Curated annotation (Swiss-Prot):
<feature type="modified residue" description="Phosphotyrosine; by EGFR">
    <location>
        <position position="3"/>
    </location>
</feature>
<dbReference type="InterPro" id="IPR003082">
    <property type="entry name" value="GST_pi"/>
</dbReference>
<feature type="domain" description="GST N-terminal">
    <location>
        <begin position="1"/>
        <end position="78"/>
    </location>
</feature>
<dbReference type="GO" id="GO:0005634">
    <property type="term" value="C:nucleus"/>
</dbReference>
<feature type="modified residue" description="N6-succinyllysine">
    <location>
        <position position="100"/>
    </location>
</feature>
<comment type="function">
    <text>Conjugation of reduced glutathione to a wide number of exogenous and endogenous hydrophobic electrophiles. Involved in the formation of glutathione conjugates of both prostaglandin A2 (PGA2) and prostaglandin J2 (PGJ2). Participates in the formation of novel hepoxilin regioisomers. Negatively regulates CDK5 activity via p25/p35 translocation to prevent neurodegeneration.</text>
</comment>
<protein>
    <recommendedName>
        <fullName>Glutathione S-transferase P</fullName>
        <ecNumber>2.5.1.18</ecNumber>
    </recommendedName>
</protein>
<dbReference type="Pfam" id="PF14497">
    <property type="entry name" value="GST_C_3"/>
</dbReference>
<feature type="modified residue" description="N6-acetyllysine">
    <location>
        <position position="125"/>
    </location>
</feature>
<comment type="similarity">
    <text>Belongs to the GST superfamily. Pi family.</text>
</comment>
<dbReference type="InterPro" id="IPR004046">
    <property type="entry name" value="GST_C"/>
</dbReference>
<keyword id="KW-0007">Acetylation</keyword>
<feature type="domain" description="GST C-terminal">
    <location>
        <begin position="80"/>
        <end position="201"/>
    </location>
</feature>
<comment type="subunit">
    <text>Homodimer. Interacts with CDK5.</text>
</comment>
<keyword id="KW-0963">Cytoplasm</keyword>
<dbReference type="GO" id="GO:0006749">
    <property type="term" value="P:glutathione metabolic process"/>
</dbReference>
<dbReference type="InterPro" id="IPR040079">
    <property type="entry name" value="Glutathione_S-Trfase"/>
</dbReference>
Length: 207
């Protein structure tokens, strides 16, 4: 396969791109980096971080740049410039919440979880609003075709359902959206695969 994902043995910042590739019927290679192999590899990585993504002779770092590249490659970037701008906006919103989530998981889980869960609805509400403004919430987050931001949002919502199983109860459109996208045949197969199931969400065992 032309694609290689180099990353730690977690879902982390790569599960959205893995779902995208699976749903687009692409195969890819996984180069798994362990705590032993990471220190010698780190100096060669552009920003001294992973994931590293290879598409033939193109090497990319930064998970959102990788998602946008795949969005352009597979026509998952809206149907026109206006939709593309909205897709970017949604993806930036996903990134904001993903950063908050990562801070909780890696720096403040025990002390901060209760407050995080309490404030979560206000962070989820914009996505419910976006769905409600697009075909009554029965389609995708932007327009009538799936975009790279949908895969990123789907992953974000699924990991929050693990953190707080009732987090989408107050958001019927988001709840239905997760069920609908998770039922897409290739995503459903990916989510049932041992690769996904056995890969921890985060690197420290907290989720």
């Amino acid at each position: 396969p032309p694609y290689t994902i180099t990353y730690f043995p977690v879902r982390g910042r790569c599960e959205a791109m893995r779902m995208l590739l699976a749903d687009q019927d692409q195969s890819w290679k996984e180069e798994v980096v362990t705590m032993e192999t990471w220190p010698p590899l780190k100096p060669s990585c552009l920003f001294r971080q992973l994931p590293k993504f290879q598409d033939g002779d193109l090497t990319l770092y930064q998970s959102n740049a990788i998602l946008r590249h795949l969005g352009r490659s597979f026509g998952l970037y809206g149907k026109d410039q206006k939709e593309a701008a909205l897709v970017d906006m949604v993806n930036d919103g996903v990134e904001d919440l993903r950063c908050k989530y990562a801070t909780l998981i890696y720096t403040n889980y025990e002390a901060g979880k209760e407050k995080y869960v309490k404030e979560l609805p206000e962070h989820l509400k914009p996505f419910e609003t976006l769905l409600s403004q697009n075909q009554g919430g029965q389609a995708f987050v932007v327009g009538s075709q799936i975009s790279f931001a949908d895969y990123n949002l789907l992953d974000l919502l699924r990991i929050h359902q693990v953190l707080n199983p009732s987090c989408l109860d107050a958001f019927p459109l988001l709840s239905a959206y997760v069920a609908r996208l998770s039922a897409r045949p290739k995503i459903k197969a990916f989510l049932a695969s041992p690769e996904h199931v056995n890969r921890p969400i985060n690197g420290n065992g907290k989720n």
